[in-house]
Regions:
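Short beta-strand edge segments in extracellular beta-sheet folds
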Residues: 416-426
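Short amphipathic beta-strand/extended segments with alternating polar/hydrophobic composition
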Residues: 361, 413-418
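Glycoside hydrolase catalytic-domain context in secreted enzymes
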Residues: 1-386, 392-410, 425-813
Length: 813
């Protein structure tokens, strides 16, 4: 491979060894993230089965979401291609050919729509985000399509992405009319059917499953990246046993979700979002209020059976250690199992959820009859609740129930933990930014009754005493002072300004397609270089190909639209006398699909693969992983995020962070800090939320990632929290992240947060401890300098931010 050190990438289109190796890993990661939701003996399919492959995602499988979470990889494998690679007997070629033509026509029309809309807005990305591509329906499935079939594989795909929430309508959250007709037709013809859901989040299936008997298997594949089709084929034909587990509850009805009709655009109010459900998010709500879901949190089937046996439980001041033995009790298939541990807390005092995830571990691959012993550590703070009035995290005296299983719905009460006296785990200061939130009525009386039931059962189970100690506070180390004049330091407060304002993909100067860079204004005088940033979290987002003017040695730009959809919207233009370079990055599974592996070792491996590509393409900071909570299934960006549970999200993000940062010169940027839970009006929506809910649900994952992974950077979110933009919030950036958690890295804004008139205020970003405004524009510089001259912004505040930035540059450059 011909590698150029001045310009990133290669002049050759040859597939390099790194691409081959990373494709192998991407396939393995995709396989582990696939969740088997139903199987009535249909899977795995026999190799010689005659299959009707149908549905809009069969040949046009969605590899990932749109926007900054997309990856411009070389090529992706569809489910059709993956099955053809295994010489599957596909008998529906005519249907697939017809759909291919419909799809291409729809794409052409959509492209024209985007180009026209882009003429009438300041930022072309706004036109793109406001008009997401909707995959067209296929023609009706007929007898001719299935007459030779012994089974059907029907693929439902959904596109979602940055800038727009999913819609509560047919063809998005619900099945389209044509999908319903096709699936009922297959049922009437008694064709055993595998239903595959290829979407960034749930699709409602309750009525379909109630009205059919021949949908014998369901796979939730999420969006699996470039090797998705191969991974699905491996699962379908039994070459890999599914081991993925849901990280988000699938409800029977959308209206079962807490505050369902108050989300985003549904109540007609995009200015404020009332977090009225409080701590009852996802399974915490369904489990506490007794609402049965379609598929529970942590659920996922296998081709084999496992037995999970409690072997011991011990405690020390740091936490509880549960020892379990897992045995593959099947006779045919090897497989992996996830052991999940939930805790029930005392219900007297502050209201609490019925159960919460406090620990988990995944086995290695076990052959039939093989066993593995797991020691699962449940950290002390996982048992704590936040008390607003006392401003402390407290582990309450009383009995705690330990539930063990392979999903929330299958977890059994297995042991008890007794705490003799209240323990203050951490003392905090009251946040200045707050709102009065009217939360939904809790179910305290019912939870107390259920607590009496499970505490009585503890008498027949193993019990241990637990005496936790107050959490040791990590001290935030201030970086060394610099003697550089304060006026010269101000350019560090914003990014390396390109000639255009952009949302993504067009702010990079040195590496085409990167998101942006720190300022290099201090390079000539002080020798301080810039750091280069690239989007994620499903890989490295770069421009796949670009041209360099030989004479001027400058890169030909493509603009915002050229950075989207792998260049599809503007096409490729070859300039005379130019040299062309290629940047072939790997499209790994999206965040949700990776998280469905429940495999911390795999996540750390993933981080190391990302770091290898960062080094190859001269990237210092990866703008990932995404840690926002799956608060509602309609959030358009859920595919980037891991889970509805902060403990799971935080521990997985910490693993990815350790993987990336194991390679010198590579750092992560965990995002979006915090409450980035809707895309419609994402830059202006104000999240009204109680301090307890904020700390226990929406900040907890970030806290775990900071303390266990030590990320180099954090990205603040666009939205307001209790009336204050996240990038302007001293509560978030300084009091919580630095003073409470000991975070000593850099905090940067999301892109263009200061551009809207009612957006974040540049100088307040600096005062709050949001060190860098990205991607930077001249107005940011003027606003900060004016505030400093007027005394609103102090020299100390500027130097604090600058010193943190300089420390990071020294570490990564």
């Amino acid at each position: 491979m011909e590698k150029n050190l001045k310009h990133s990438g290669t002049r050759s289109t040859e597939v390099c060894q790194r691409e081959i190796d990373h494709a192998v890993f991407a396939r393995e990661a995709a396989e582990e993230g696939i969740v088997l939701l139903k199987n009535e003996g249909l899977l795995p399919l026999k190799k010689d089965t005659k299959i009707a492959l149908l549905g809009i995602g069969a040949e046009k499988t969605i590899k990932g979401g749109t926007g900054s979470g997309d990856v411009n990889n070389r090529e992706s494998v569809s489910i059709y291609a993956g099955m053809k690679e295994k010489n599957a007997g596909i008998v529906s070629e005519e249907w697939l050919k017809d759909y291919h033509n419909r799809y291409e026509q729809a794409r052409t029309e959509w492209k024209e729509q985007i180009l026209e809309a882009a003429k009438h807005v300041d930022n072309p990305f706004d036109a793109y985000a406001a008009n997401p591509f909707a995959m067209p329906d296929g023609r009706a499935v007929t007898n001719e399509d299935i007459e030779a079939a012994e089974a059907a594989v029907y693929v439902i795909s959904r596109i979602s992405g940055e800038g727009k929430d999913r819609r509560k309508r047919k063809g998005d959250y619900y099945l389209s009319d044509q999908e319903e007709k096709d699936l009922y037709f297959l049922n009437e013809q008694k064709i055993p059917t595998v239903l595959i859901i290829n979407a960034g989040g749930p699709v409602e299936l309750t009525d379909l499953l109630a009205g059919t008997e021949n949908i014998c298997a369901i796979l939730n594949i999420s969006q699996l990246g470039q090797e998705g089709g191969n991974a699905v084929a491996d699962i379908l034909f039994g070459e890999f046993t599914p081991s993925g587990k849901l990280t988000t509850t699938w409800t029977k009805r959308y209206d079962d979700c807490p505050a369902a009709e108050e989300f985003s655009y549904l109540n007609g109010n995009l200015e404020t979002e009332e977090y009225a459900e409080g701590i009852y998010v996802g399974y915490r709500y369904f489990d506490s209020f007794g609402i049965e879901p379609l598929f529970s949190f942590g659920y996922g089937l296998s081709y084999t059976e496992f037995d999970i046996r409690l072997c011991g439980i011990n405690t020390d001041s740091k936490g509880v250690t549960v020892t379990v033995e897992v045995e593959n009790t099947g006779t045919t298939y090897s497989g992996k199992e996830v052991v999940q541990i939930y805790a029930s807390l005392p219900q007297d005092g502050s209201r609490k959820e019925f159960r919460r995830l406090v620990g988990y571990e995944k086995t290695e691959e076990l052959k039939p009859g093989e066993k593995e012993m797991l020691n699962i550590v449940l950290p002390a703070k996982a048992f704590a609740s936040f008390l607003e009035e006392q401003q402390e995290w407290r582990i309450q005296a009383g009995a705690y129930g330990i539930w063990i299983g392979n999903s929330l719905s299958e977890a059994k009460l297995s042991a008890g933990v007794k705490v003799s006296a209240d323990v203050m785990m951490e003392k905090t200061k009251k946040l200045e930014d707050h709102s009065e939130v009217v939360e939904i009525k809790d179910c305290a009386e019912e939870l107390c009754r259920r607590a009496e039931e499970w505490t009585a059962l503890l008498e027949e189970l193993p019990n241990v005493s637990f005496e936790p100690e107050t959490e040791e506070k990590k001290v935030c180390r201030f970086p060394e002072e610099t003697e550089i004049p304060v006026e010269d330091l101000i350019p560090l407060m914003y990014g390396n300004m390109s000639e255009i304002r952009s949302t993504l993909g067009a702010s990079g100067i040195k590496v085409p397609g990167t998101a942006g860079e720190t300022s290099e204004a201090l390079l000539d005088q002080y020798g301080i270089p810039s750091l280069i940033m690239a989007d994620g979290p499903a890989g490295i987002r770069l421009q796949q190909t670009y041209e360099v003017d030989r004479e001027k040695d400058t890169v030909y730009g493509t603009g915002v639209l050229g950075s989207l959809e792998n260049g599809y919207l503007v096409g490729r233009k070859d300039h005379e006398g130019a040299e062309r370079y290629y940047q072939y990055c790997t499209a790994f599974p999206v965040g949700t699909a990776l998280a469905q592996s429940w495999n911390k070792k795999l996540m750390e491996q993933f981080g190391r693969k990302v770091a290898a590509e960062m080094e190859e393409f001269h990237i210092n900071l990866w703008l990932a992983p995404g840690l926002n909570i799956h608060r509602n299934p309609l959030c358009g960006r859920n595919f980037e995020y891991y889970s509805e549970d902060p403990f799971l999200a935080g521990t997985l993000a910490a693993a990815v962070t350790r993987g990336v940062q194991s390679r010198p010169g590579c750092g992560v940027t965990i995002k979006h800090f915090a409450c980035n839970n809707q895309e419609d009006n994402r830059m202006g929506v104000d999240a009204h939320i109680s301090e307890r809910t904020l700390r226990e649900i929406y900040l907890r994952g970030f806290e775990i990632a900071v303390k266990e992974g030590a990320p180099t950077a954090i990205m603040s979110s666009y939205n307001l929290i209790n009336g204050v933009h996240a990038a302007n919030s001293k509560d978030l950036c300084t009091r919580i992240a630095r003073e409470e958690w000991g975070f000593d890295g850099v905090i940067m804004s999301d892109w263009n947060t200061t551009v809207p008139e009612d957006g974040s205020i540049p100088w307040v970003c600096v005062a709050a401890g949001n060190d860098i405004i990205m991607p930077g524009n001249p107005d940011d510089d003027k606003n900060i300098r004016d505030a400093y001259k007027e005394g609103k912004l102090t020299e100390k505040e500027i130097r604090l931010c600058a010193n943190r930035i300089l420390k990071l540059i020294r570490r990564l450059s």
